[in-house]
Amino acid sequence: MSHVAVENALGLDQQFAGLDLNSSDNQSGGSTASKGRYIPPHLRNREATKGFYDKDSSGWSSSKDKDAYSSFGSRSDSRGKSSFFSDRGSGSRGRFDDRGRSDYDGIGSRGDRSGFGKFERGGNSRWCDKSDEDDWSKPLPPSERLEQELFSGGNTGINFEKYDDIPVEATGNNCPPHIESFSDVEMGEIIMGNIELTRYTRPTPVQKHAIPIIKEKRDLMACAQTGSGKTAAFLLPILSQIYSDGPGEALRAMKENGRYGRRKQYPISLVLAPTRELAVQIYEEARKFSYRSRVRPCVVYGGADIGQQIRDLERGCHLLVATPGRLVDMMERGKIGLDFCKYLVLDEADRMLDMGFEPQIRRIVEQDTMPPKGVRHTMMFSATFPKEIQMLARDFLDEYIFLAVGRVGSTSENITQKVVWVEESDKRSFLLDLLNATGKDSLTLVFVETKKGADSLEDFLYHEGYACTSIHGDRSQRDREEALHQFRSGKSPILVATAVAARGLDISNVKHVINFDLPSDIEEYVHRIGRTGRVGNLGLATSFFNERNINITKDLLDLLVEAKQEVPSWLENMAYEHHYKGSSRGRSKSSRFSGGFGARDYRQSSGASSSSFSSSRASSSRSGGGGHGSSRGFGGGGYGGFYNSDGYGGNYNSQGVDWWGN
């Protein structure tokens, strides 16, 4: 045993001697500069210039690649080559390698194709490869796979001619002139190429006015409904400016803040949305318009794994889409800093306040490090802007321009609206008749009021042999995304939904919206029927009405008259008997749909004319300049106290089937 121990000891001595920790005369080309320096075995007997240990960068580096990662202190692989180019590197080979960037947010079922090398370690490829030195306005090489993924959906069947009749108002000092074509304003090579890939032929009304306003760096409050193209209206000019200006101080602050995944991210643009579905939708649009650029969009929202979202942020974030609650969480965790946020967008602003997000919004905008108004550029978009919310906008916007765009669908008559008296007990059988008449392959969206009602109706339709699915707030994020995927793809052409899907979801080719249960306020009705007839396409909206819905009689009547829709005689009689009390139909001073707009600029006096851009359709027999200026606020049911529920049972079933227009 002792003999073996002696041999082992000798063997170890020989091995340590081979390491030669104290002498490097025979290594590194005999350089005296390296005397006393430990040389790893795999780098011995090489020239000094091949590799060295840099005390300043705290890591092994190669001289030729030192510039690429000097700020990161990264180490090279065994060939002296930066790990940026290694299969196991912490960053991708570039933004458009063969793995692409398919799933930055980790949502959906494609999470295995992340696009950041085989082993993701929080690498930040677009922010570290000299991205502060490169020209951000120049497009990166194309990726056929990513291009197919982002743009294969296409925009088919768009009826832009219908948009010509939509009225538009712009009020404010020195309003920039609107454009007629995307080429009328300089947005750069990247944006114009992506516009061509999305097959946008010409801007929608809200884009015609909003794009030049934002390009002029003016604050904007736009009253425009979802489906009008408002998402692109703010993404296009914001991204164009980022490409033109570059990352600026945000990149330097990110590098100085920490190393690798511990870095706080400083987005250049922030978009706030009320729901996770709308946030994901905006993020997907941002991915399209940031294709072939160095801008990396990210999305964070509640109801999903925060760890995955943090890992996604750690790879870099220039444009952030977020729900208010989750963003506050990220800020308190030290993952997001708003010090260099140049562009702030509040999408569906009325909905966010309605959902109680005002404290979080004020926390984000006013009580943190976000630049003040006048320094940052702020945009608010929504389908309606009551006077109370316009007054609130004074705290966020500086010398803003108010843009009111007529409601897409109702004003342009793209959506045929039908209101049918159906007793509560007859709704299911009537729904089956509608589904049979619509056709099996047509996408049909059925709205109900409660989560329990959604599950019950889905179960009923399933047992009746219909391919259907449902979505509501109690479903997990994965279940909701899967339901939307099944619906969009046509595998389940019937989607039963609560109000969670009514706001902002961009589901193309929905042919029929059915209000199985009418909402309690007219704004929710406008959003629901806006799921069909989107972006100029034609659609049909059918609503089941009975004594439970008397509270919206007046507003529903006003909306149908304005949109030049057929008004059932029983609805006129009901509105006359229970609310108007002798005043002529449609002349209520409190009409919230005055002139075809969801709201008007409260800064304009009630007698002043503020219409700079309008069509003949904007004129109306109804008067009143308040738009949605009543003091009722949100929640609906404002007129519920004026009505009782008796006297209407079954007296209006004589409509037959000709309501469908056949």
From Swiss-Prot:
Changing residue 181 to A: Greatly impairs phosphorylation by TBK1 and fails to synergize with TBK1 in IFNB1 induction. It is an enzyme of class 3 (hydrolase). It is found in: Cell membrane; Nucleus; Cytoplasm; Cytoplasm, Stress granule. It is linked to Intellectual developmental disorder, X-linked, syndromic, Snijders Blok type: A disorder characterized by mild to severe intellectual disability, hypotonia, movement disorders, behavior problems, corpus callosum hypoplasia, and epilepsy. Additionally, patients manifest variable non-neurologic features such as joint hyperlaxity, skin pigmentary abnormalities, cleft lip and/or palate, hearing and visual impairment, and precocious puberty. One of its GO terms (biological process) is positive regulation of type I interferon production. Changing residue 347 to A: No effect on general translation. Keywords: Acetylation, Apoptosis, ATP-binding, Cell membrane, Cell projection, Chromosome partition, Cytoplasm, Cytoskeleton, Disease variant, DNA-binding, Helicase, Host-virus interaction, Hydrolase, Immunity, Inflammasome, Innate immunity, Intellectual disability, Isopeptide bond, Membrane, Methylation, Nucleotide-binding, Nucleus, Phosphoprotein, Ribosome biogenesis, RNA-binding, Transcription, Transcription regulation, Translation regulation, Ubl conjugation. Widely expressed. In testis, expressed in spermatids. Expressed in epidermis and liver (at protein level). This is ATP-dependent RNA helicase DDX3X.
